[in-house]
Structure formats: structure tokens, C-alpha cells
């Protein structure tokens, strides 16, 4: 049985957020992000992260699902405190940057306001 450790919804899409997605990255930040950062982010209504992010968990973005393949050293802390992480759709087994989560699967083409973000332990 899957155990949901995080659940939220996209509330706003920054002007340049789609550009990052085209480059294989999705940047999340909670509501209230500084304006200069929010322009590049998919802003979400932040929830409590019930457990640290780990390799093997599944993240759902809208209707798509992805396996987490690497977790940066500060990704869980940043996500818990700031609602901020960068997701890279490259399936790397080593995190490039401390705040990055790498996921396996086809790069998401679009995410909409109201789409759900969910992270589960399988």
C-alpha cells in the first residue's frame, strides 16, 4: 500500500517556468516565493513533508508518475522549509546539486494551475 508523504497543488506558474521545463527541469517553490524567483517556478500550496525524500519514492506531477533516482543533500530540508526543490528529468543516480532531486521518466510537457503534486512511498 502506498503511503502519501506529501500532497499539494500548483497555485501559480511563473512567466519563465515553462522554459525550465523545456530544458528538463521543474522548479517548485511554495506560495510567497520572492517575485524574482517565482517567475521561474511552479508555485504550490505547501504542505508538511511527512518524511525525508528518498531514492525509490514516486512523485506524481499531474497525471504523470516518476521514480526518484537521486536526492541532493539539502533537498529534503529545502522542500520542508521553503517548499523549494528542483526536479531534473534525467534519471541520474547521483545528485548534481544539493537541492536537486533527479527523477526517471519522460520530461513533463506541461503542468497547470490546480495540478496535484504527490510524493509516496511504495
Each PLM stretch: what is its role?
Residues 37-48, 94-103:
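Short, structured beta-strand/loop micro-motifs enriched in basic residues and often containing a Trp
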Residues 57-67:
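Short coil-to-beta-strand transition motifs
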Residues 75-86:
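Short, solvent-exposed secondary-structure boundary/capping segments
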Residues 64-65, 71-77:
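Short, conserved beta-turn/loop elements at beta-strand boundaries and strand-helix junctions
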Residues 51-53, 59-60, 111:
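Short, well-ordered loop/turn sites that connect or cap secondary structure elements
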Residues 27, 91-122:
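Helix-rich interaction surfaces within compact, conserved domain-sized segments
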Residues 1-24:
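N-terminal, charge-rich interaction modules
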Amino acid at each position: 500500500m502506498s503511503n502519501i508523504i506529501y500532497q499539494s497543488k500548483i497555485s501559480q506558474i511563473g512567466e519563465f517556468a515553462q522554459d525550465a521545463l523545456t530544458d528538463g527541469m521543474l522548479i517548485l517553490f511554495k506560495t510567497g516565493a520572492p517575485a524574482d524567483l517565482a517567475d521561474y517556478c511552479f508555485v504550490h500550496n505547501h504542505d508538511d513533508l511527512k518524511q525525508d525524500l528518498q531514492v525509490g519514492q514516486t512523485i506524481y506531477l499531474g497525471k504523470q508518475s516518476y521514480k526518484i533516482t537521486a536526492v541532493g543533500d539539502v533537498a529534503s530540508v529545502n522542500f520542508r522549509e521553503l517548499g523549494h526543490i528542483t526536479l531534473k528529468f534525467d534519471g541520474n543516480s547521483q545528485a548534481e546539486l544539493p537541492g536537486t532531486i533527479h527523477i526517471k521518466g519522460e520530461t513533463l510537457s506541461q503542468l497547470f494551475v490546480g495540478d496535484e503534486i504527490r510524493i509516496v512511498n511504495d
